[in-house]
Structure formats: structure tokens, C-alpha cells
Amino acid sequence: MKSIQVQQLVEEFNLEVLAGEDHRERTITKSRTHRPGLEFIGYFDFFPMERVQILGKKEINYLHQLNEQERDIRIGNVVNYHPPCFIVTSDQDGLTYLKKYCHAEQIPLLRTKEATVDFMAKVDHYLTRKLAPEIAVHGVCMNVLGIGILIRGESGVGKSELAHTLLGRGHRLVADDIVVLKRLSHKTILGTHNDKNKEFLALRSVGLLNVVRAYGSRAFQDETRISLDIKLSKWEKDSLHNELEFETQYRDYMGVSVPSIEIQLQPGRDVAGLIEAAANNWYLQQQGYSAAEDFMNRIEWQDGDD
């Protein structure tokens, strides 16, 4: 199971540490945050104690209104579950009683100036990406016409050279050689780099190329949702490819099915143009249009007239 430390949240969101400063190595394993409103009134049946606990104005105002004895009971009941950390939003103060309990139980108490809803959305987004299951695959990841494409193929087939051609046509590189795939949901795969290969494209006979330095910041994109899987293969004379085939092929990545096509390479073929055509065709299919079905309907209609 993937995890991050509370300290990484502190650094990412510039959080103020109010208590538990020596325990920021506590681990976070869940990608969603939680506001413990029901728990403060004593309902713990579905308390997700493994999540980061967010205390907004509603929670803090409720605690302020309680008498000291009742407040100690309510806070103690929640803190005793030992969540990874508590984060107070909207720069709220008057938190002496929270500091006392968090210090005693060695739980970091943090604070941000941001509003609750906006802050939770940012933290959820960050944790989802950090804690998502991931694999590394050999290939190139590009954003073509706003569509994330994973390009695969044997070593030396020309993936990086193709990526360079696509860059020249105004598209964006995400990762070359090693592509990190993250499963964000049951139907979403995110493609990104591994930090080491960020912005770099390896071209045979040329060497490493920093695409941002060479072509500007618009040549690079940090991540993209993978919508198409394209395999480059060597030309096979006797292979059969039916342009009128209706059935879409898929490739599985961590339980997510991604539409997949194969492009056979041959001298003189405009492979970059075929990639653009595949991206455009995928977009039309998402709008409910199939060129193959449209063509066959026309044939049937004309045959019926005859």
C-alpha cells in the first residue's frame, strides 16, 4: 500500500504546525479527507479514522460552544482513534484545547488560511495522485489535440522520433522511455513522467533533448488522462486490417480498459498524421459518431434504392 508522510502535506500546502511537530513522519494511506462532524456528537459507526481530518468553521464553532467538560469528552473520543493528522482551516484560533489533546496523543495539528471546501478539494486531488496504484511501462506518452495517447512498440521502432515529429506539429510531450501510469478510478488512467525523465526526449544519433529548453514550455505537459493506446509495429505484408471493423480493441491497465489500435510502420507512411487522425476519430466516437457505421449505412441505403 502506498503512503506519504504528514510532512509532505505540510510542505506541499505550506501548513502551520500547531502541535505534534515531532510526529510529522506519521503516514497517510487514504486519498480522501474527512470532516468529523458526526463523530463530535458521538456517532462513530462509519468513522474513516485513516483519513486526514479537516476541521472547518462548523466543527470549531461547535466545539467552542460546549462547556469545558463536554468539549474534552467530544475531542478525546475523536483524538483517541489516532488519525494521521488534524488540519484546521480558515486560519481559526482559540485552539488551546485541541493543541493539548494532539500533543498528548502525538498527532500533528496543522492550520491553513484557506477556506474549507477549496482546501479539501486541493488535498483530495493531491492525495489521489500521490496514493494511486501505479505501474511503469516502456513507451512514449503524448497529448495530441487535447487527447492523452500512450505509444508503445519494440525498442528501436521509432517511438521517440515520432514524438519529436508530433512536437513539431504543436503537440505536447508528457514522458519518454518510461511512462508512469496511475489508476485514479475504475475508468481513469493518468500518464505522467517519473521526475527523472521530465521534459527529456531521447533521440537516437542525437542524444537527450530538453523539449522545454528547445521548443518552449508549450511543448511539455506534466500529466494527461490516457484515452488511447497505440502500438507501433513493423509492416507485415500478409497481415489483415479491416478498416470497416466496428469492434473496438482494448488494452487493460490495472483493470482499466483503454481503446487500443495498432499502426504498422512502412517507409513513407505519415505516422504522425495517422496518430492525429486516430485522436480525431476517438473524439468523434466519444460524440457518438462512427465513420465505419456511417459508411455502411450509406452503402445499405444505396443498395436498397437499386
Curated annotation (Swiss-Prot):
<keyword id="KW-0479">Metal-binding</keyword>
<comment type="function">
    <text>Catalyzes the ATP- as well as the pyrophosphate-dependent phosphorylation of a specific serine residue in HPr, a phosphocarrier protein of the phosphoenolpyruvate-dependent sugar phosphotransferase system (PTS). HprK/P also catalyzes the pyrophosphate-producing, inorganic phosphate-dependent dephosphorylation (phosphorolysis) of seryl-phosphorylated HPr (P-Ser-HPr).</text>
</comment>
<dbReference type="InterPro" id="IPR027417">
    <property type="entry name" value="P-loop_NTPase"/>
</dbReference>
<protein>
    <recommendedName>
        <fullName>Putative HPr kinase/phosphorylase 2</fullName>
        <ecNumber>2.7.11.-</ecNumber>
        <ecNumber>2.7.4.-</ecNumber>
    </recommendedName>
</protein>
<dbReference type="GO" id="GO:0004674">
    <property type="term" value="F:protein serine/threonine kinase activity"/>
</dbReference>
<feature type="region of interest" description="Important for the catalytic mechanism of dephosphorylation">
    <location>
        <begin position="264"/>
        <end position="269"/>
    </location>
</feature>
<keyword id="KW-0067">ATP-binding</keyword>
<keyword id="KW-0418">Kinase</keyword>
<comment type="subunit">
    <text>Homohexamer.</text>
</comment>
<keyword id="KW-0723">Serine/threonine-protein kinase</keyword>
<feature type="active site">
    <location>
        <position position="159"/>
    </location>
</feature>
<dbReference type="InterPro" id="IPR011104">
    <property type="entry name" value="Hpr_kin/Pase_C"/>
</dbReference>
<keyword id="KW-0460">Magnesium</keyword>
<dbReference type="GO" id="GO:0005524">
    <property type="term" value="F:ATP binding"/>
</dbReference>
<dbReference type="InterPro" id="IPR028979">
    <property type="entry name" value="Ser_kin/Pase_Hpr-like_N_sf"/>
</dbReference>
<dbReference type="Pfam" id="PF02603">
    <property type="entry name" value="Hpr_kinase_N"/>
</dbReference>
<feature type="region of interest" description="Important for the catalytic mechanism of both phosphorylation and dephosphorylation">
    <location>
        <begin position="201"/>
        <end position="210"/>
    </location>
</feature>
<feature type="binding site">
    <location>
        <begin position="153"/>
        <end position="160"/>
    </location>
    <ligand>
        <name>ATP</name>
    </ligand>
</feature>
<dbReference type="InterPro" id="IPR011126">
    <property type="entry name" value="Hpr_kin/Pase_Hpr_N"/>
</dbReference>
<keyword id="KW-0119">Carbohydrate metabolism</keyword>
<dbReference type="GO" id="GO:0000287">
    <property type="term" value="F:magnesium ion binding"/>
</dbReference>
<dbReference type="GO" id="GO:0006109">
    <property type="term" value="P:regulation of carbohydrate metabolic process"/>
</dbReference>
<dbReference type="GO" id="GO:0000155">
    <property type="term" value="F:phosphorelay sensor kinase activity"/>
</dbReference>
<keyword id="KW-0511">Multifunctional enzyme</keyword>
<comment type="similarity">
    <text>Belongs to the HPrK/P family.</text>
</comment>
<keyword id="KW-0808">Transferase</keyword>
<keyword id="KW-0547">Nucleotide-binding</keyword>
<feature type="binding site">
    <location>
        <position position="160"/>
    </location>
    <ligand>
        <name>Mg(2+)</name>
    </ligand>
</feature>
<dbReference type="InterPro" id="IPR003755">
    <property type="entry name" value="HPr(Ser)_kin/Pase"/>
</dbReference>
<dbReference type="GO" id="GO:0004712">
    <property type="term" value="F:protein serine/threonine/tyrosine kinase activity"/>
</dbReference>
<dbReference type="Pfam" id="PF07475">
    <property type="entry name" value="Hpr_kinase_C"/>
</dbReference>
<dbReference type="InterPro" id="IPR025662">
    <property type="entry name" value="Sigma_54_int_dom_ATP-bd_1"/>
</dbReference>
<feature type="active site" description="Proton acceptor; for phosphorylation activity. Proton donor; for dephosphorylation activity">
    <location>
        <position position="177"/>
    </location>
</feature>
<feature type="active site">
    <location>
        <position position="138"/>
    </location>
</feature>
